[in-house]
């Protein structure tokens, strides 16, 4: 695992508008400050991902998403709390509380509270992060630091070393309103 100093350095890069790569539960991720439109635009350009698709926000704790969850029905809040931290991403109504560069054309946003210690340590310092697989569109998700560096040679502001979490597949994605599975794990 990365040292506390390395995590602090990565957090500083994020807070200064940088784009980083880091290991997650199953694949390497790219991340940046979700409130920094320039950083998000750069991340999307690196991935060759259109903004209309939207992005995932990852956090250390459910409380980091309180500004989105406070007005939701109690049953939905209980469903989220029971599944986090863990490999569960939920599509949650954003109630126009997030910019379009995060949500794309959707009325919901993808949220996950990670159980990966490195992701959690990073989010404790930065707050929620954009989290998307570290790969250009149409290519397999990176499962090693070497692959990240091959995909994005000298294009990232920081690559935070560490091990993947051991899961074979990316997180399950479900719609909070319906319970429907959008992507199985």
UniProtKB/Swiss-Prot annotation:
UniProt GO molecular function: ATP binding; double-stranded RNA binding; L-threonylcarbamoyladenylate synthase; tRNA binding
Limits of the YrdC-like domain: 4-185
Record-level GO BP terms:
regulation of translational fidelity; tRNA threonylcarbamoyladenosine modification
Q: Is Nucleotide-binding tagged as a keyword? A: yes
Q: Where in the cell is it found?
A: Cytoplasm
Q: Which reaction(s) does the protein catalyse, per the Swiss-Prot or TrEMBL entry?
A: L-threonine + hydrogencarbonate + ATP = L-threonylcarbamoyladenylate + diphosphate + H2O
Kind of enzyme, top EC level? transferase
Q: Which Pfam families match?
A: Sua5_yciO_yrdC
Cleaved signal peptide residues: none
Q: Does the keyword Glycoprotein apply?
A: no
Q: What is its main location?
A: cytoplasm
| Its EC number(s) | 2.7.7.87
Which InterPro entries does the entry link to? DHBP_synth_RibB-like_a/b_dom, Sua5-like_dom, TC-AMP_synthase, TC-AMP_synthase_SUA5
Question: Sorted alphabetically, which keywords does the UniProt record give?
Answer: ATP-binding, Cytoplasm, Nucleotide-binding, Nucleotidyltransferase, Transferase, tRNA processing
An example Gene Ontology cellular component term from the record? cytoplasm
Say which family it is in.
Answer: Belongs to the SUA5 family. TsaC subfamily.
User: HAMAP family annotated for this entry?
Assistant: TsaC
The job of this chain, per UniProt, is described as:
Required for the formation of a threonylcarbamoyl group on adenosine at position 37 (t(6)A37) in tRNAs that read codons beginning with adenine. Catalyzes the conversion of L-threonine, HCO(3)(-)/CO(2) and ATP to give threonylcarbamoyl-AMP (TC-AMP) as the acyladenylate intermediate, with the release of diphosphate.
Entry protein name? Threonylcarbamoyl-AMP synthase
| Natural source organism | Ectopseudomonas mendocina (strain ymp) (Pseudomonas mendocina)
Lineage start: Bacteria, Pseudomonadati, Pseudomonadota, Gammaproteobacteria, Pseudomonadales
């Amino acid at each position: 695992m990365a040292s506390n100093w390395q995590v602090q350095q990565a957090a500083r890069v994020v807070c200064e508008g940088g784009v980083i790569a880091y290991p997650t539960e199953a694949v390497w991720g790219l991340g940046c400050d979700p409130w920094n439109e320039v950083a998000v635009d750069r991340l999307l350009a690196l991935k060759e991902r259109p903004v209309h698709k939207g992005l995932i926000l990852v956090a250390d704790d459910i409380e980091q998403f309180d500004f989105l969850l406070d007005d939701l029905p109690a049953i939905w809040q209980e469903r989220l709390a029971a599944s986090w931290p863990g490999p569960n991403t939920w599509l949650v109504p954003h109630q126009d509380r997030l910019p379009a560069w995060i949500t794309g054309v959707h009325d919901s946003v993808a949220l996950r509270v990670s159980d990966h210690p490195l992701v959690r340590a990073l989010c404790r310092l930065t707050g929620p992060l954009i989290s998307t697989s570290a790969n250009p569109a149409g290519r397999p998700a990176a499962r090693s630091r070497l692959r990240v560096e091959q995909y994005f040679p000298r294009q990232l502001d920081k690559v935070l070393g560490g091990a993947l979490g051991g899961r074979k597949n990316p997180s399950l994605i479900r719609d909070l309103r319906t319970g429907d599975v959008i992507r199985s794990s």
